């Protein structure tokens, strides 16, 4: 049975929702500091201030519709080598043509950029970005930034 609760809810011992009386005794700030989200943000924050975060990611993911813009921006900013695992996949496999894909030139550009800058190139028709990142790159507690078109 599912019970709908409105407003903020506090979980006690990862098991039950606190009563109104129990919840009133809990500091909202302390409760927030005990969340998984807070712990991940704290681990990746490189400032001394949790109000003004300076996040450093563990990995990065890029897919074919965003390759060119991301790579050109990175190179224009002086990037020589990716400072973290950077995966390039080909999510738009439905754009197929006889003998390849409509995006073949973009895929070749990304593959050469990966060889030049130390990225990980996943060939067309092998994986989509979210799947590859989840299965091969990101582990519990990591923070990854991944491009998307929507």
Q: Over which residues does each language-model region extend?
A:
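Fe-S-dependent hydro-lyases/dehydratases of central metabolism
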Residues: 1-150
């Amino acid at each position: 049975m599912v019970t709908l609760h409105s407003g903020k809810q506090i979980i006690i011992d990862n098991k039950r929702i606190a009563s109104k009386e129990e919840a009133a005794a809990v500091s909202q700030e302390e409760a927030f500091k005990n969340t998984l989200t807070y712990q991940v943000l704290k681990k990746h924050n490189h400032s001394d201030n949790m109000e003004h975060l300076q996040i450093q990611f563990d990995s990065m993911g890029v897919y074919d519709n965003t390759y060119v813009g991301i790579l050109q921006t990175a190179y224009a900013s002086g990037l020589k080598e990716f400072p973290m695992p950077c995966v390039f996949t080909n999510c738009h496999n439905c754009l197929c043509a006889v003998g390849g894909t409509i995006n073949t030139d973009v895929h070749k550009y990304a593959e050469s950029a990966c060889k030049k800058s130390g990225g990980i190139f996943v060939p067309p028709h092998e994986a989509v970005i979210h799947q590859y990142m989840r299965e091969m790159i990101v582990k519990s507690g990591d923070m990854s930034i991944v491009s998307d078109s929507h």
